[in-house]
Amino acid sequence: MADLDDIKDGKDFHTDKPQTNTLFSLKGCGALDWGMQSRLARIFNPRTRKTVMLAFDHGYFQGPTTGLERIDINIAPLFEYADVLMCTRGILRSVVPPAINKPVVLRASGANSILTELSNEAVAVAMDDAVRLNSCAAAAQVYIGSEHEHQSIKNIIQLIDAGLRVGMPIMAVTGVGKDMARDQRYFSLATRIAAEMGAQIIKTYYVDKGFERIAAGCPVPIVIAGGKKLPEREALEMCYQAIDQGASGVDMGRNIFQSEDPVAMIKAVHAVVHHNETAERAYELFLSEKG
């Protein structure tokens, strides 16, 4: 029982000052629960509202592709330079050190391979396991215009509903149907559908014409995929243009871990995303950091 004689009555309540609570201002997150906003504040830098995600989840359908043969040797040295790690639960448990203390976006869709129809995915992770792994978000593909469009949208809806119950953001990743053009009209459609379903983050591709319309028409943050390996200067230009036109960050894999110098490249990408460096300045940084 409390010692009532030792309880001192409070005196300084600062009655002349209204109570404040610093809000985490991120596009589309104002009505989200505290836990979900807290996870998003780990993914997106609270100062810049941007993020540099390092994607190395490719093995879930590609196997040990170039650069991902040994995650512990090729990818682990990059962890400290990334804001966020995007990977599968298998790699997270077997390779990623728990003490790295980086937010994780967990790949939560799968059940396909490059030998089959890529759009034929299922939810591959239960939400309680994503929570058990201390993930900050879960991610799944959505294939608008593909043979399995309906199933991929159902997968996203299932994850969103499960995520809302536990405060877990969901990132919808826009895969491209075989017969769909990679243009502004398609990605405006795909990103908007995913956001309308309730995804809190959208990962999509940058397009040269009309990307600002894609970003403006999507009510939640967009991060761009790196896509196929480009020359470093071109990849940095893509990053710069995407950020300049409304993207909230990048989720890059091959353009970092297949670079001539992956550490130098992720540092250059960070300079573009968080410090508004031009592609030219960032490429100069890449060359100066290159071993």
Curated annotation (Swiss-Prot):
Catalytic residues (UniProt): K203
Keyword Amino-acid biosynthesis: no
Gene Ontology CC entries for this record: cytoplasm
Main location: cytoplasm
Location in or out of the cell: Cytoplasm
Keyword Transferase: yes
Family annotation (InterPro entries): Aldolase_TIM, DeoC/FbaB/LacD_aldolase, DeoC/FbaB_aldolase, FbaB-like, LsrF
UniProt keywords, alphabetically: Cytoplasm, Schiff base, Transferase
EC number: 2.3.1.245
Gene3D superfamilies: Aldolase class I
Record field: catalytic activity: dihydroxyacetone phosphate + acetyl-CoA = 3-hydroxy-2,4-dioxopentyl phosphate + CoA
GO molecular function, one term: acyltransferase activity, transferring groups other than amino-acyl groups
Assembly behavior: Homodecamer.
Job description of the protein: Involved in the degradation of phospho-AI-2, thereby terminating induction of the lsr operon and closing the AI-2 signaling cycle. Catalyzes the transfer of an acetyl moiety from 3-hydroxy-5-phosphonooxypentane-2,4-dione to CoA to form glycerone phosphate and acetyl-CoA.
Family (UniProt): Belongs to the DeoC/FbaB aldolase family.
Protein's recorded name: 3-hydroxy-5-phosphonooxypentane-2,4-dione thiolase
Organism listed in the record: Salmonella typhi
Gene from which this protein is expressed: lsrF
